[in-house]
Regions:
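Beta-propeller folds
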Residues: 1-149
Length: 149
């Protein structure tokens, strides 16, 4: 049996696998959140739960979105932000959702991603520079972000 200190460290204080960062759509049709696949997997994915069907699905997963095989690259600015907020997760650690928009935005690896909640369709905008803190507009058509700031 694994000792408590080892288990506590491996599961990052028993937070791996726990859902977090919930957002509710304006009509209450969808709840979006971040969660890894299991208590052994540190990479958060973006999930959506449908009130009409009661089904939960992964709508964005960095392992499938980043196909260069090198994994996630984190900028100095993003590392500093994660340290300030004591973020210990990996993968998708934050996203922007607006209750009136059918889309969600997040950033990783010098790319800006827009995901359709219902369709799970992902648009990847590779910008070639470090970006962080994307914010989606109420209608979901525009995304603002910070770069070199």
């Amino acid at each position: 049996m694994e000792s408590f200190p080892r288990q506590n460290a491996r599961t990052r204080r028993f937070t791996i696998g726990a859902p977090r960062s919930f957002s509710l759509s304006a009509g209450g049709d969808w709840i979006t959140f971040l969660q890894s696949s299991s208590s052994e997997d540190p990479l958060n994915k973006l999930w959506a739960w449908s009130a009409s069907s009661g089904q939960t699905k992964v709508i964005a997963d960095l392992e499938t979105l980043i196909d260069n095989g090198s994994g996630e690259t984190i900028s100095r600015e993003e590392l500093a932000r994660r340290e300030r907020v004591r973020e210990i997760g990996a993968g998708i650690v934050s996203y922007s959702a607006n209750g009136h928009s059918p889309n969600i935005a997040f950033a990783s690896n010098q790319s800006l991603f827009k995901v359709g909640i219902e369709s799970s369709e992902v648009s990847d905008f590779t910008l070639g520079r470090d970006i962080f803190d994307p914010q989606i507009s109420p209608n979901g058509n525009l995304i603002a972000y910070v770069s070199e700031g």
